[in-house]
């Protein structure tokens, strides 16, 4: 990270984070990281950015719609890093393949509705409850955090039609 900020002259780094690792630790980089070690790693990255007057995006690096573990992680991150001007929140990395329950071939409008409001979706053949982006944002704000939040469009973030169709005009 030092090289990226100091040698390359970067002003911003996107740090992929995983809610399962945040909650339980992980086997990562051939090391068995505990929850505490994983969270310290993220904290060290945030401190490095802040010490240099740079920025870091904490990027929830999953493609499937947010679920309860994502929401829980964002609540904790909002408390820990809320109003830290070095930290931006990437709510969900490149969402795609949003399949509402009971819909064979979902339209873009149906996918955007789930993106915004959440709902029951199929993931890997199983029904799960998706948390909408508005709920994520609401929970972050309830914790008192005013950090910039980044919300990508559908289909690996290429489809931003929902923003053009009014999702950006809803209260947040």
List each language-model region with its residue ranges:
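Extracellular glycoside hydrolase catalytic/binding regions
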Residues: 1, 55, 67, 71-81, ...
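Aromatic-lined substrate-binding rim segments of carbohydrate-active enzymes
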Residues: 2-76, 80, 129-143
């Amino acid at each position: 990270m030092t090289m990226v900020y100091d040698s390359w002259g970067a002003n911003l780094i996107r740090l992929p984070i995983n809610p399962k690792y945040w909650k339980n630790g992980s086997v990562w980089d051939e090391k068995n990281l505990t929850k505490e070690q994983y969270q310290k790693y993220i904290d060290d990255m945030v401190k490095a950015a802040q010490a240099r007057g740079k920025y870091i995006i904490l990027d929830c690096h999953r493609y499937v719609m947010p679920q309860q573990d994502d929401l829980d992680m964002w609540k904790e991150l909002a408390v820990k890093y809320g109003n830290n001007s070095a930290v931006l929140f990437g709510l969900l990395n490149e969402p795609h393949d949003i399949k509402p329950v009971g819909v064979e071939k979902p339209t873009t409008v149906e996918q955007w509705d789930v993106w915004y409001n959440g709902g029951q979706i199929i993931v890997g053949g199983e029904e799960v409850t998706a948390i909408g982006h508005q709920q994520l944002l609401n929970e972050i704000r309830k914790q008192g955090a005013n950090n910039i939040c980044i919300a990508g469009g559908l289909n690996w973030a290429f489809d931003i039609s929902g923003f053009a169709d009014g999702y950006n005009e809803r209260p947040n």
